[in-house]
Regions:
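Active-site/acyl-donor-binding loops of N-acyltransferases
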Residues: 2-10, 119-147, 276-346, 350-362
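Aromatic (often tryptophan-rich) hydrophobic motifs at membrane interfaces
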Residues: 95-96, 201-313
Length: 362
């Protein structure tokens, strides 16, 4: 490999690094490459700080093959891209380039990715980060409905017929981006918060950020009865992928299963709008499998310049291991949240999170 005008070139790959810069063309290229919310500029702008954000781009010919946005501070390169799959050769190339370019960098951190690290060039730590359930969408809503299990399909049809029979004014409407009414989102978040908090821990959504992101790439489904919002969901679209974010339903209409109907109607609408994938998010909820979601697990990855640097950062390495076990414990607790001991631990955890959030805001 040779260096030419600040870029590294091989026979097929050219690598460029834009320090404290995110070129405009990267927004569409990120969508083309990863097609995921958590590696998109709208998400970074709302949920991450874009100050002093730099860009790594590997080119094959005139087309990028890898784009990773990162921050470098205190000897650590923090990659913002999440929930993506990276080929090991690409990841190895990135690590070698970054350690060569930033001589004081000791660690490269990924929050959530899928990759093979067999015979990797550098010492690594790899532990469970999170998961998500993904539905591969067929060409039509009819095909999707037919693919559902018989009991799920029958249940949806029964609940839909029942709510229409009992409430002829029942309607489902979709709004995108600037069409979205902020009040609709607030009401959906409130309904969602009430349901989550009913499990005995105080919970609140980040309303401002959700509204801001929805205005940029949102798809909001609102269910009305007699002109009143009775259920709904906030979703996002990046490229050909849709992402379910928040779902809320009024307790008064619980017998109609409006939560399940909201999700089903949103998935069907995503298909109509040429969606290829629908992300149901993480968490061990049975309905996600029944709606044809397939679990995709992601790992946290820490890459060290050397074993010596790993030992010098032993405190961080230990924290990474502990965090991985805590995440796995959190998944187990949610699977068994009806048990008294698990419920107590979950309540304590969410109480601590809310106290930390208030402390950060004050």
């Amino acid at each position: 490999m040779i260096t030419i005008d600040g870029a590294i070139q091989s026979d097929e790959i050219t690598i460029a690094c834009y320090i404290n810069e995110v070129p405009l063309f990267l927004e569409t290229e990120l969508v083309r490459l990863y097609d995921t919310l958590y590696s998109s500029l709208p998400f970074f702008k709302v949920y991450r700080s874009t100050e002093q954000l730099s860009s790594y781009v590997a080119w094959c010919g005139n087309q990028p093959t890898t784009i990773l946005l990162f921050k470098f501070r205190n000897g650590r390169i923090e990659v913002l891209n999440e929930m993506i799959e990276i080929d090991q050769a690409e990841l190895d190339r990135f690590a070698r380039y970054m350690f060569a370019k930033f001589s004081s960098a000791n660690i490269i951190s990924f929050k959530a990715l899928k990759t093979d690290t067999h015979r990797f060039s550098f010492p690594i730590q790899k532990c469970y980060a999170n998961d998500t359930y993904v539905i591969t969408l067929p060409a039509t809503p009819k095909e999707y409905t037919a693919a559902l299990g018989k009991s799920t399909r029958t249940g949806i049809r029964y609940q839909m017929n029942k709510v229409v029979r009992d409430h002829p004014s029942f309607t489902s409407r979709f709004y995108v981006n600037e069409e979205i009414e902020e009040q609709h989102i607030r009401e959906i978040l409130k309904l969602s918060g009430v349901r989550i908090s009913s499990k005995a821990f105080n919970f609140s959504h980040d309303e401002k950020r959700i509204i801001r992101l929805a205005k940029m790439c949102g798809l909001v489904n609102v269910l009305f009865i007699d002109g009143r919002l009775c259920a709904g969901s906030v979703n996002y679209r990046i490229g050909s992928s849709y992402f379910g974010a928040v779902m809320g339903q009024d307790f008064a209409y619980e017998k109609y299963g409006l939560g399940k109907l909201t999700i089903y109607l949103t998935i069907c609408e995503s298909i109509v709008r040429q969606g290829k994938r629908f992300y149901l998010g993480g968490g061990p909820f049975d309905y996600k499998s029944r709606m044809l979601g397939v679990q995709h697990e992601m790992d946290r990855l820490e890459i060290y310049r050397s074993y010596g640097k790993l030992m010098l950062n032993f405190d961080r390495a230990a924290k990474t291991v502990i965090d991985g076990y805590v995440r796995q414990l959190n998944v187990w607790l949610h699977k068994h949240e009806d048990k008294l001991g698990a419920k107590f631990v979950l309540n304590s955890y969410y109480l601590w999170k809310n106290l930390m959030k208030k402390d950060q805001q004050s």
